[in-house]
Amino acid sequence: MKPSFFSSIVIVILCTLILSSCEQALFAPTPGADNASVFDSMWENVRNKYTFFTFKRIDWNALRTKYRNRAIDARNDEELFTVLAAMLNELQDDHTNLKSHFDISRAQPFFNDSANFDIGIVRRFYARKQELITGSLVNFIIERNGKKYGFIRYDSFLSPIDTIAWNTVLRRFRRENVEGMIFDIRNNGGGALANAVFLASRLAKRRSEALLEMTKNGPGENDYNTPKKLIITPDTSAAEQQYRFIDKRVAVLTNRNSYSAASFFPAILKSPEFDHVRLIGDHTGGGSGLPMDAQLPNAWTYRFSGTKSFIPAGLISREQALAAAPRANHDADWSIGYNFEWGVPVDIKIDMNLADRSRDAIIERAVEYLATGR
């Protein structure tokens, strides 16, 4: 993903096949790629372009001391890969990976957090086999006390949301005269920001200057470009009004496994143009930096965050910031806004009791909000 809100990830992998055997080609050494030059190439590039050292209180120079000799002493590709992956994982950033022909490293910084999601419970006790699969949107109706609530499950922002599918679901909800809508993006690992922008444009009451993005443009700690704005512009034409859900309450369900684009979408919803929307569940997993790609002298590729994004100043309190990201240095960019790299704070925090196999406490709390506004 290039460092821009509306651009796509472009990964270029250069492979040079040598000899006639596929196995020989895959495992052939790269001439001149000694361990020291491979390590130094990665360390220096990340030093110059990574965006969250200050926010995460990371001493990159100290990590060079910690890992460089280990890399030099690595006896084979697997050992070198392990050292480089361990250093990248110190960034605590799930947009950071090292890729070789035999493995891909993963950080998973919130892997041990409560899942707060069980798709089996949703299917058995809420969908009850009456869900429709409309494009990438699984949708059904929840009934409580004579009232109906529309429910949408969106598994991945990698799955395109087209206008026809969205409009079809909205027409169904209008026919059923739902009191509000639940939009579930728990355990959504992200994908295309264009899908987040599409959804936000259908929920925005008016034009919104939703987020700010900064891109690293030099090796210095403060070498960034002027913040760019992400603008959400809804279609306000009369023909599109029935497909904008702005007249009733919306609950967006999140957990720590809502990452990347599944954090950008909730971050957008913090703007005042979405005052009918509440985030319910657990804080998101974050991922506010868009990844940039690079290649090492031995032909391995890697990626790391080359931008940082913010909810504009004044929309997130210090208390909320610390609740979502207690280990972060929020003073680093507080005058610009809240950096949601380690999570977007929810409006209503609630955890599931996974011992209760017939109830989703987060869905139940969402229904309460839709019914009462509280």
At which residue positions do the language-model features occur?
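Bacterial N-terminal signal peptides that target proteins for export
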Residues: M1-I9
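Intrinsically disordered, low-complexity segments enriched in polar/charged residues with Gly/Pro
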Residues: S4, F125-Y126, L279-G281
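Residue-level detector of functional hotspots within protein domains
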Residues: S8, N167-V169, T236, W334
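C-terminal "post-core" interaction segments
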Residues: A25-D40, G190-R374
